[in-house]
Structures are given as C-alpha cells and as structure tokens.
Amino acid sequence: MSSKTASTNNIAQARRTVQQLRLEASIERIKVSKASADLMSYCEEHARSDPLLIGIPTSENPFKDKKTCIIL
C-alpha cells in the first residue's frame, strides 16, 4: 500500500515539475546585452528625478530633525 502511495506522490510531483518547466519555457527571454542597454537607458532617462542621485531638498526632507538638541 505504501508503494502505491509513493508512486502516486511521484506522479504528482512529476506533473508539477512538468507544469513548472512548461511555464518557464514559455517566458520570453532577451539577451543580457540588450537588457543591460535597456536598463542603462532607463536609468539615464530617469536620473533627474532620482532622489538618491540628486538628493532631497532640506525643506522637503521628512526625516530631518526640526529642532536641535538643547542639552549639548
């Protein structure tokens, strides 16, 4: 009886594997050289609005302390 259960589990696992492989095979792929060129182009186009590159104006920074420490 346990061999029948093991066989059923193996078949179910094999079906899941085949389904996953079919899904992965259907994904459209592009060359790394094209993907990296597209990524660099996107970064260059959006660099002017990137706060990590241009910084956040002090007046708009919500994390800046409003007051200085009086104890020091």
Curated annotation (Swiss-Prot):
N-acetylserine carried by residues: S2
Molecular function as annotated in GO: G-protein beta-subunit binding; PDZ domain binding
Membrane topology, as annotated: Lipid-anchor
Maturation propeptide residues: 70-72
S-geranylgeranyl cysteine: lipidated positions: C69
Matches recorded under InterPro entries: G-protein_gamma-like_dom, GGL_sf, Gprotein-gamma
Subunit description: G proteins are composed of 3 units, alpha, beta and gamma.
Designated name of the protein: Guanine nucleotide-binding protein G(I)/G(S)/G(O) subunit gamma-12
Gene: GNG12
